[in-house]
């Protein structure tokens, strides 16, 4: 099959439905088909548009498929989704979307389905979703918000008035969040440099030092990225690192650090002095940290493979610790659309909560008296956030919740057990952080 962005997107979608890990399967397919430039961007746009809107796409397609989508061969199913996504969300003319879809049935050796694809798409592309009726609010969220049943039920239970807006929120306004390297430039100067180097748009973000930019392709293809003028990091993640308030000359540990964005910010706060231990449990992800640190020219970072659920004797007592723990990811549905369809199984949730709890206990042992611990997640699940902190404080009365070192954006307020960002309230990712101090003389 000749290199074709639509074919690449469909092939990646087939793999994603089988294996998950959306970014990995897409990257592998783009490399296999050797797509570059606009073709690569177009294939990526189709892929992520389908994932983001799959619930809506499937609902519409099923209006014209009496036996449903599940009975179709996987390539045919993804061809239908991809074509409808192009026509409905990507400003591709209906005729082009349909004709190319029919061609793809032949390319994937499914030519017997070409008539069905043609007929279903011509009806589906003109379907008026406003005429749809739903059994209940959860089904409405699943269709209009493109979510699986578990995620829809979670949002309906915990955020009933904001659920649909959370599902349809565009992360950072659809722009890419960056962090300027203060060793080379300021956020204001970076905006100017980005526009001069081909970015379509660049402006200051909500979090101090952050920049929001829109690129033609990947930010990693920009020369300023290769030269270490910025790294890609969500605004909420930047805020967590800022709240650590790392100081020059200190000993700091980033317990769950890969791919390294928060480590970079911590090292910059320390003016590349002191010692910063950047840890991850997977050796291949530690390699990502080392690559990021080298690109930014930071000299005070030691990246190491480490299980954060256990105390490693090789790690010293630290002045400050950041524990950005593994979580359900329910705050970043806009950035990782495959999470919309995840199963929220009680056994897995219990295992995740136990892991978070163990990491907090490790941090408690590694932190010096008077030191600061920042716990953060990219979820809006109270069990992983406020309830996790309440349980930690009950186990560790030597800790006290303190005011975050960085100013919180509008809409994000600190409570008894931490501060929560809900996308609809802050314009950032869904996110939680809690700054705590260990009893003893406060760090200066």
What are these regions (language model features)?
Residues 1-444:
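S-adenosylmethionine
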């Amino acid at each position: 099959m000749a290199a074709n962005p639509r074919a690449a997107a469909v092939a990646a979608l087939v793999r994603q439905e089988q294996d998950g890990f959306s970014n990995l399967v897409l990257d592998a397919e783009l490399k296999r088909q050797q797509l570059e430039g606009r073709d690569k961007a177009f294939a990526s746009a189709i892929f992520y548009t389908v994932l983001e809107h799959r619930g809506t796409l499937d609902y519409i397609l099923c209006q014209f498929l009496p036996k449903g989508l599940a009975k179709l061969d996987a390539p045919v199913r993804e061809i239908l989704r991809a074509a409808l996504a192009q026509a409905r969300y990507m400003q591709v003319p209906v005729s082009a979307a349909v004709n190319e879809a029919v061609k793809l049935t032949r390319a994937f050796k499914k030519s017997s389905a070409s008539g069905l694809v043609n007929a279903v798409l011509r009806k589906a592309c003109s379907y008026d979703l406003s005429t749809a009726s739903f059994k209940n609010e959860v089904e409405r969220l699943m269709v209009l918000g493109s979510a699986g049943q578990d995620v829809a039920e979670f949002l309906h239970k915990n955020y009933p008035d904001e659920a649909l807006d959370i599902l349809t929120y565009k992360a950072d306004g659809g722009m890419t969040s960056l962090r300027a390297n203060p060793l080379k430039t300021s956020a204001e100067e970076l905006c100017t440099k980005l526009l001069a180097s081909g970015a379509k748009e660049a402006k200051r973000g909500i979090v101090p030092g952050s920049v929001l930019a829109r690129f033609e392709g990947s930010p990693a293809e920009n020369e300023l990225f290769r030269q270490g003028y910025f790294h890609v990091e969500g605004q909420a993640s930047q805020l967590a690192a800022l709240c650590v308030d790392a100081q020059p000359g200190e000993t700091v540990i980033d317990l769950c650090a890969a791919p390294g964005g928060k480590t970079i910010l911590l090292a910059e706060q320390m003016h590349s002095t002191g010692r910063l231990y950047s840890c991850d449990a997977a050796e291949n992800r530690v390699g990502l940290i080392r690559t990021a640190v080298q690109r930014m020219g930071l000299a005070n970072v030691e990246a190491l493979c480490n299980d954060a659920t256990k105390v490693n004797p090789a790690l010293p007592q630290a002045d400050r610790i950041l524990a950005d723990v593994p979580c359900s990811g329910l705050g970043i549905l806009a950035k990782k659309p495959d999470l919309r369809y995840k199963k929220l199984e009680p056994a897995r949730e219990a295992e995740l909560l136990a892991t978070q709890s163990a990491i907090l206990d490790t941090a408690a042992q590694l932190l010096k008296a008077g030191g600061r611990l920042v716990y953060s997640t990219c979820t809006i699940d109270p069990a992983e956030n406020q309830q996790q902190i309440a349980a930690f404080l009950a186990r560790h009365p030597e800790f006290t919740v303190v005011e975050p070192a960085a100013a919180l954006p509008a809409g994000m307020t600190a409570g008894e057990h931490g501060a929560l960002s809900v996308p609809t309230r802050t314009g950032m990712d869904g996110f939680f952080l809690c700054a705590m101090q260990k009893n003893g003389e406060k760090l200066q």
